[in-house]
Amino acid sequence: MNDIKTPEELLTFMSQNINYGYLGKNGKIYHYADFDFNTKWYEQYILENSEELLNNKYGNCFDQVEFEREWFLKNGYKIETIYEMVKLEYNNEYPTHAFLVYKDDNYWCWFENADSNNRGIHRFTTYEELLSYQYHKYLEYLKKYNIKAEEITKIITTVFEKPKEHISAEEYIEHVTNSKIINFNKK
């Protein structure tokens, strides 16, 4: 990891070495293509630390963001880690997402490896422009799940601090949803 000097090098390293999946409490690695990937997630998921992620070569966006956090902070960047979800009073199947943004010169950059459809470093002139762009990407994805108009108003975006290692999916979601809500222009 010490030989990775730039965000671009980090993205290349991660895209070549980290697969989308997660480590279960039972020690099993769940790959995205596994038949029980989604059904076991809430019951089995634990947040990996960076060493485990490197050894297992699997992590979801939660795990990958913590790996990214470690690298960016070690290399002196100003960062924020952001979470988005549809927060309803009932269980729902809508996907959530965590991602990292960082300041580079006069730009805000969205660093994305876990979401292979949006993989890359996306540069924006303002923080608000970045948040609005990502919100619309998330909304576009949610429409594939036939999200209802009234549920769209329940999308929250939070900025969160580093969670504890090895917490469950439930504990992670509690941590990030109880973090600071970011208000921004979603148009």
Where are these regions (language model features)?
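A structural boundary/capping signal
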Residues: 1-187
